[in-house]
Amino acid sequence: MSAFENARKFFDACESPAGWEGCKEYVVDGAPFTAQSEPLVDVTTVQAYCDWMAGFGTVTAPGATYDLHTSGYDENTKTAMFFATYHATHTGEGGPVPPTGKETHSHYVYFLTMNDDDKVEKMVKVWNAPWAMKELGWM
């Protein structure tokens, strides 16, 4: 399996949301996660992010979906990129306020740096969290 194929499998598992159990075979243990987004400030590993997504997509906004618009892979930097829109409605517990019934359609980008074993060794998420939080009625 190629690095890009594994990156795609990780992306799909993370967004489905399969949680860490569904993602860990594609990720190096302890792989760092970064995002300059308010809700994710304390999330520092890919494992923690996968679990955060699973909680959001099964408890806070069950049934959330995504549309993948484009993806690519840079062989020189071993980096996969995925640009998508996340669709979610706040119908469950777990947000900063009781369920609002409001929805978001929020763009985001993942950058996944792969190692020589074709596993994710670092993840960066670019996401305008305030946009999503406003749409969900959280701000």
Show the residue positions of the predicted features.
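C-terminal and inter-domain tail/linker signature
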Residues: M1-M139
